[in-house]
């Protein structure tokens, strides 16, 4: 038995998938920015690299805290609005990291960012997969995962261009965290 030719995605399905892919990509972008500038932030705030590494752990620990309320909210009213609010939330929090005056404030902001990360994946993946035709969900869920690698690549390129080439501080990189909100809204 042959496999039927896959139908083109309708605009609603395509847009939902692109929104989820961009959300996941930009989530990874901001998440990996911290890793790329650990040493510089540690120097600026006078903390050890071990304490800096805790920022990553703290961010990940907060994911479940964001996943549950955003998921419940989405089950009540639909996926789009909670996803847009979530992306705006983590974008603004990521941007605020650029203005952190000390390690404690940066840690608090990364904890809040983790809440946004938790909401984004569940909402984006659910929205995309609900809109994708049943017979193509496996294919598109695989493509969706590429977004995280793409986010890391974009973070590395941003680091290279903004930090290494232009010579701007780590704070400028966090200024780029507003991109997800601008793209999604």
Predicted regions and their residues:
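Transmembrane-helix signature of 12-pass secondary carriers
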Residues: 1-185
């Amino acid at each position: 038995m042959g496999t039927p030719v896959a139908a083109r995605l309708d605009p609603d399905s395509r847009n939902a998938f692109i929104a989820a892919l961009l959300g996941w990509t930009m989530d990874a972008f901001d998440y990996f920015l911290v890793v790329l500038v650990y040493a510089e932030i540690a120097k600026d705030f006078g903390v050890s690299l071990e304490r800096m590494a805790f920022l990553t752990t703290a961010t990940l620990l907060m994911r479940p805290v964001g996943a549950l309320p955003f998921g419940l909210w989405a089950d009540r009213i639909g996926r789009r609005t909670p996803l847009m609010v979530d992306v705006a939330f983590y974008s603004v929090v990521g941007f605020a990291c650029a203005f952190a005056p000390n390690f404690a404030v940066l840690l608090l902001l990364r904890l809040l960012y983790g809440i946004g990360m938790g909401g984004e994946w569940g909402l984006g993946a659910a929205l995309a997969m609900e809109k994708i035709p049943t017979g193509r969900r496996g294919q598109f869920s695989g493509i969706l995962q590429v977004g995280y690698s793409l986010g890391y690549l974009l973070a590395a390129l941003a680091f290279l261009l903004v930090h290494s080439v232009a010579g701007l501080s780590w704070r400028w990189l966090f200024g780029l965290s507003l991109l997800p909100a601008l793209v999604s809204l």
